[in-house]
C-alpha cells in the first residue's frame, strides 16, 4: 500500500508539472516526482542508487530552475486549474486502486530485482557513457526550458 501511495504522489507531481504556468510550481512538481521515484527505488532495493540519483537530479534541476526563473520571473505565480490537477490525481488514483485486488502480491513480486551494487557496477562497466548521456539530457532540458520561456511577452528581463 505504501508503494501505491508513493505512485499517487508521483502522479500528483507530474500533473502539477504539466498544468503549472510558472516555473516555481513546475520545480515543486519535479521535486515531488524525483523524490517519490527515488523512494520507489529504495523500496525495490536500490537505496544507494536512489540517493545518488536524487542528488544528481536535484543539482541538475537547480540549474534549469535558476535559468528559467531568471528569464520568466512572474510577480504572481499561479497554477492553471489547480482543481483540475487535484481532480485528475484523485480520478487516476481511485481508478488504479479499484482495479487492483490485492496490493500485497504486487509489492512482494518486485522484492529482489534491483540492487544498488549491480547498477553501480553497470555504470562502471559502461566507462562513463551513462554520465555523458545524463549530461546531454540535462543540457537538452536546459535548452528546452530556455526556448519555452523565451516566447513569453512580459518578462522581467524584457521590461528592463
Swiss-Prot record:
Cellular compartments annotated: Mitochondrion membrane
EC number(s) given by UniProt: 7.1.1.2
Transmembrane spans: 1-21, 39-59, 83-103, 128-148
Keyword field: Electron transport, Membrane, Mitochondrion, NAD, Respiratory chain, Translocase, Transmembrane, Transmembrane helix, Transport, Ubiquinone
One GO cellular component term noted in the UniProt record for this chain: mitochondrial membrane
Catalyzed reaction equations: a ubiquinone + NADH + 5 H(+)(in) = a ubiquinol + NAD(+) + 4 H(+)(out)
Keyword NAD attributed: yes
Topological category with respect to the lipid bilayer: Multi-pass membrane protein
Group of enzyme by EC: translocase
Domain of life, source organism: Eukaryota
InterPro entries xref list: ComplexI_Subunit6, NADH_UbQ/plastoQ_OxRdtase_su6, Nuo/plastoQ_OxRdtase_6_NuoJ
GO MF term set: NADH dehydrogenase (ubiquinone) activity
PANTHER family: NADH UBIQUINONE OXIDOREDUCTASE SUBUNIT ND6, NADH-UBIQUINONE OXIDOREDUCTASE CHAIN 6
Function: Core subunit of the mitochondrial membrane respiratory chain NADH dehydrogenase (Complex I) that is believed to belong to the minimal assembly required for catalysis. Complex I functions in the transfer of electrons from NADH to the respiratory chain. The immediate electron acceptor for the enzyme is believed to be ubiquinone.
Protein family (similarity comment): Belongs to the complex I subunit 6 family.
Protein name, UniProt field: NADH-ubiquinone oxidoreductase chain 6
Amino acid at each position: 500500500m505504501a508503494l501505491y501511495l508513493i505512485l499517487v504522489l508521483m502522479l500528483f507531481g507530474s500533473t502539477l508539472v504539466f498544468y503549472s504556468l510558472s516555473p516555481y510550481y513546475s520545480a515543486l512538481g519535479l521535486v515531488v516526482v524525483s523524490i517519490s521515484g527515488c523512494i520507489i527505488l529504495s523500496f525495490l532495493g536500490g537505496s544507494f542508487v536512489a540517493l545518488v540519483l536524487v542528488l544528481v537530479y536535484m543539482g541538475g534541476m537547480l540549474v534549469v530552475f535558476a535559468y528559467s526563473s531568471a528569464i520568466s520571473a512572474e510577480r504572481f505565480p499561479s497554477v492553471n486549474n489547480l482543481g483540475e490537477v487535484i481532480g485528475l490525481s484523485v480520478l487516476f488514483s481511485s481508478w488504479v486502486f479499484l482495479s487492483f485486488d490485492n496490493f500485497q502480491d504486487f509489492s512482494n513480486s518486485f522484492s529482489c530485482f534491483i540492487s544498488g551494487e549491480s547498477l553501480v557496477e553497470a555504470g562502471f562497466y559502461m566507462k562513463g557513457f551513462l554520465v555523458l548521456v545524463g549530461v546531454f539530457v540535462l543540457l537538452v532540458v536546459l535548452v528546452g526550458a530556455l526556448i519555452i520561456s523565451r516566447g513569453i511577452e512580459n518578462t522581467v528581463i524584457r521590461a528592463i
